[in-house]
Amino acid sequence: IVLTASQPFTTALIASNMREFKYCWIWDKVRGVGFQIAKFRPMMRTEDVVVFGNGNGALATYNPQMVERDKIKKSKCYSSSDSSPLAYNDGLEREYTHKYPTNVIEVSNASQKGKVHPTQKPVALMEYLIRTYTNEGDVVLDNCMGSGTTGVACVNTGRKFIGIEREPRYFDIACRRIEDAQRQARLIA
């Protein structure tokens, strides 16, 4: 279960189920929001992405989205048969071109063409989270689908999607956006 939130709701959300809370990501929106109240408080540039899961974390799907290194790291490999970390196998050098992600996801909210919902997220953010926590062909549920961004991201990443939205206006918008994404996917395929 992956939910987005901001304080103080983040704290209440985590406290609601401490047993299944795993960790938080920080979504860096690159550009601050809330300019209307900037005279009274800092503009908000980040939002929390709260991850929950039941049972053993080792059983949950986690596909880390590796980040390309600016500079290739070269390192000598340790011998698997030698217990000393100082003993190198001569000539075995490995190049590391990627690194594991940190808990900060930088996805700009500035380039959201046609934003139609007040809490609409960028498709790229949802694609990142979907690739991280699901495999192709999995089913993703969005019980507050708003304008359908998660559904669009599911189409783009080869996942199935179930969306729930109580506002008929937003439900219609979501259906149109998802159908458009499906048409685009068929054109590319």
Predicted segments — roles?
Residues 1-173:
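Core catalytic lobe of class I
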Residues 176:
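Acidic/aromatic/glycine-rich contiguous surface patches that form carbohydrate-binding/processing clefts
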Residues 179-189:
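S-adenosyl-L-methionine
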